[in-house]
Amino acid sequence: MSYSGEMIREVAANAEPEPAAQPEDLGRYFLERANAGDVEGLVALYEPGAVLAFPPGRLAAGHEEIRKVYAELLADKPSFGSAGQRLAIRNGDLALTSTRLPGGGATVEVARRQPDGSWRWVIDQPAVLPCGDQGNGSRSGSPHPRRAGPAARVDDR
């Protein structure tokens, strides 16, 4: 039996996204899926009750709200990059993940090991800027028209 290219693409489009075997996989999968415009693949990186602090100053809670945020964000087909991912800090079934952004700043996330051994984010703060930075942080390191609003800041204590 032979399959047409259209059938193969349809099966691939409906395939479940690969789960993160390690917490560090989440950042890599984010970049791959965001740059591919894969909203559902991005949503799969989060637990059903996860919280995403994006755009800055707003919270999206749960898959439905996170899906809306990423559908709007990816509508303009932005390009996402990273200046390097830090090793996750683990404590049992929790992990703190972080990625440095090309334009400065960083992302900070809390991931949790799932019953099947995979990892998903439960809290995502993708726009933490260095003190004194007045821009709107993002994973791409550059402002985006839909990313207006107060930027999250690292508290200097």
Please tell me what each predicted stretch does.
Residues 49, 56, 115-118:
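Residue-level recognition of short loop/turn positions
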Residues 39, 75-79, 116:
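Generic structural signal for secondary-structure transition and capping sites
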Residues 46, 90-91, 114-115:
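Structural motif
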Residues 2-8, 106-137:
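Short beta-strand edge/turn micro-motifs at domain boundaries
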Residues 22, 51, 56-58, 64-108, ...:
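Surface-exposed, charged secondary-structure patches
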Residues 46-47, 101, 125:
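Short beta-strand segments enriched in hydrophobic/aromatic residues
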Residues 1-48, 131-157:
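Short, low-complexity N-terminal intrinsically disordered segments enriched in polar/charged residues
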